[in-house]
Regions:
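Non-catalytic terminal and connector segments of soluble metabolic enzymes
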Residues: 2-162
């Protein structure tokens, strides 16, 4: 189905399924939630953080007393990088992710259902459209993205939304 609406708010956003999720065998469950919601996977790969890439991605936290814990956690095992696409994808994914602290996250969100920690919190999700674009460029090259039609698309949105 072709998009007809010039005002369609189709966006891409980044999700990082963190090492703690992989260690707990939750990666498939986490990814499945986004697919079931109707978000489309347009890029996906496993990745191992380096000190440099961790400092770049978490630049706003470098210098904080807890940064070394984040760095250690993110480098402990591979992560899964996922680019998701959908209308208002950034906001939708953030809502599905839940509060940063697993103890405060609402039941029904990824963090609310799967974690108790503030730092070992299963998933990273871009917090704005601008950051999503920047983060996607940080981890993916243009050729990593795939455009494809899905037969479910007409059932996910009303005709005037697309």
């Amino acid at each position: 189905m072709q998009r007809k609406n010039a005002n369609c708010r189709m966006e891409k956003t980044l999700v990082i399924i963190k090492p703690c999720a992989l260690q707990r065998a939750l990666a498939g469950e986490v990814l499945s939630r986004f697919e079931k919601k109707g978000l489309k996977i347009v890029a996906l790969k496993m990745y191992r953080f380096t000190k440099e890439k961790c400092a770049e991605h978490y630049a706003h936290l470098v210098g904080k007393s807890f940064y070394h814990i984040i760095e250690s956690s993110m480098m402990a095992a591979p992560v899964i990088l996922v680019a998701l696409e959908g209308i208002d994808a950034v906001e939708v994914v953030r809502e599905m992710t839940g509060s940063t602290s697993g103890r405060k996250a609402l039941s029904g969100t990824v963090r609310g259902d799967y974690c108790m920690s503030h730092q070992e919190n299963i998933i990273h999700a871009s917090d704005s459209k601008e950051n999503a674009e920047k983060e996607l460029r940080r981890f993916f090259d243009e050729q990593d993205f795939f455009e494809y039609d899905t037969p479910l698309f007409p059932y996910l949105y009303a005709e005037d939304e697309i």
